[in-house]
Each structure stands twice: as C-alpha cells, then as structure tokens.
Amino acid sequence: MFVTAAYAQSTTTEGAEAHDAAAAGEVHTETGVAHEGEHGSGVFPPFDSTHFASQLLWLAITFGLFYLLMSKVIIPRIGSILETRHDRIAQDLDEASRLKGEADAAIAAYEQELAGARAKGHSIADTAREAAKSKAKADRDGVEADLAKKIAAAEARIGDIKSKALADVGAIAEETATAIVKQLIGGTVTKSEIAAAFKASAGN
C-alpha cells in the first residue's frame, strides 16, 4: 500500500513535468521563437540569416512604394515648381530687357535734347553777342557823331568869341593909343593912322 502510494506520487510528478514541458513548447511555437532562443547564440535579429528573405521582401516593397511616391507626387510637383520658376525668371528677364531698352531710348533722347539745347544756347549767345556788338558800335558811332557836332559847335563859338575879342582888343588899343598920343604930343591922330600903325607893328 505504501509502495503503491509512493509510485503513484512519482508518476503524478513526472506527468506534471511532461505537461509543463509540452505547454512551454506550444508557447514557443506560437510566438515563432525557438525554445533554444532562451539559451540561443545571441545574434541580433536583423543580422540573423534566417530573416534575410523577409527583410529583402519588405525592402523591395518599401522601395517600390517610395519610388511610386517620388514618381507620381514629389517629382511632378518639383518639376512644376521648377517650370513655374523658369517661366517667371524668363518673364523677369524679358521685362528687364524691355526696361533696359526703354532706359537706353530715354537716355539717347535726353542726350539728343541736351545737345540741341546746348547748340541753341550757343546760337542764342552768339546772336546776343553780335547784337550787343552792333548796338554798342551804333551807340559809339552816335556818341562820336554827337561829340563831333558839339566840338564843331564849340569850336565855331570859340572862333566867334575869339574874333569878337580880337575886334574889341583892336578898338580898345586904338582908343588907348589915341589917348596916349594926345597926352604925349598934344595932337590928335585919326583911327586910320592908328590902324595902319597896328598893322605895321603886327607885320613886323
């Protein structure tokens, strides 16, 4: 009886251990991890050669999705942006060229107008200079003619005054000479005699 009970207990213990081992094997099978993983080689899973096939598959799928995203979305959008910028740059260059042409034309017109204004200014200055010279010459000629007339009139007046003065001096001299002769010799002389005497003295 005692032996039978001990045998039954050992049998029960062995059965429990076998059941636990079977359960552990099922758990490892369901998780996809080998039982020897607990005591395994310690290799990092991405570097494990048993996983290369699945890694290559996911790499191909990821690359394909990335290629589709690039070719269908990103690259067309970048191309559209580049084309828009290219068109805008071309328009800006055309506008800059047009503005440069307008600026060059405006500068040429300004220089032409400036040259015309300078030529007109020189012409006006030359005309004014010639007109001033002509007016100055005419004024000078008029002044000289006026002075010549005044000088001629003054000379004529001076001649008249001189002639009158000389005539008065002759009469005074004759009267003085008559008075002197009368006082010296007590006689009288005629004006003709005194005039003849003055002429004779003037001739000497």
Swiss-Prot record:
It holds the Pfam family ATP-synt_B. It is a single-pass membrane protein. Belongs to the ATPase B chain family. The gene is atpF2. The keyword Disulfide bond does not apply. InterPro entries: ATP_synth_b/b'su_bac/chlpt, ATP_synthase_B_chain. The chain crosses the membrane at residues 56-76. One of its GO terms (cellular component) is proton-transporting ATP synthase complex. It comes from Sinorhizobium medicae (strain WSM419) (Ensifer medicae). This is ATP synthase subunit b 2. Keywords: ATP synthesis, Cell inner membrane, Cell membrane, CF(0), Hydrogen ion transport, Ion transport, Membrane, Transmembrane, Transmembrane helix, Transport. It is found in: Cell inner membrane. The keyword Cell inner membrane applies. One of its GO terms (molecular function) is proton-transporting ATPase activity, rotational mechanism. F(1)F(0) ATP synthase produces ATP from ADP in the presence of a proton or sodium gradient. F-type ATPases consist of two structural domains, F(1) containing the extramembraneous catalytic core and F(0) containing the membrane proton channel, linked together by a central stalk and a peripheral stalk. During catalysis, ATP synthesis in the catalytic domain of F(1) is coupled via a rotary mechanism of the central stalk subunits to proton translocation. F-type ATPases have 2 components, F(1) - the catalytic core - and F(0) - the membrane proton channel. F(1) has five subunits: alpha(3), beta(3), gamma(1), delta(1), epsilon(1). F(0) has three main subunits: a(1), b(2) and c(10-14). The alpha and beta chains form an alternating ring which encloses part of the gamma chain. F(1) is attached to F(0) by a central stalk formed by the gamma and epsilon chains, while a peripheral stalk is formed by the delta and b chains.
